[in-house]
Amino acid sequence: MGFSYAPTVQVRSGEERAALVRRTYGLVFLSVIVTVLGSAFALSQEAVLGASAQHPFIMLLCLLAPLWMAQRAAREFPKNLILTFIFTFIEGIFIAPFLYVANRTAPGVVGQAAVLTLAAFGVLSLYAVVSRRDFSAWGSFFMVGLVVLFIAMIINAFVGSAAGGLWIAAVGVMVFAGLLVFDTWRLLRSGMYGQDDYVLAAVAIYLDLLNMFLFILSLLTGGRNRR
């Protein structure tokens, strides 16, 4: 997943690209840590956990606002980092009820999903690095898949089919795996990012990683608990 933008200062050398990659993955790592802290906070506060579970649409609005602002201020340091961390902390609160239900359904499954996600992240990132393929067409293809996935999730929310939820989880893993390869290729190989675009790149990869984790977790719990 990614945002529309025009690079400000194009990366011109291998050293500049290496710096961009370090800053991007550093921010991805910190964003994951902040998300874990957000979930830990919600899980330790019954009132916060209950509010997140009972008012998902309000939480979604609270989530999208800093994401939108982070996109708008993507090149304005330190505002870009502050907004990104606000977004990822709220994201942790937002997914906390799902983590709670998943762990109650199958104790230890959250850790298993995290390990599988990290393994998949490593393999897919390596594939994007070593492959000589041009992945530019993957973005539009998997974005269409994302729209279809979203529609299927809405339909299944009313139908309540466990089998449907399982299929949605499996497709969700594949869609975000494809988007992760695309966004990694875009960072490492495409030359689409400028020197100051590390926040845009990091948020795109973070969202791919997080959603892949959530769909893997849903798959491990039988597709019943995807929020």
Language-model features, listed with the residues they occupy:
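A hydrophobic alpha-helical transmembrane-helix feature that marks the membrane cores
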Residues: 1-227
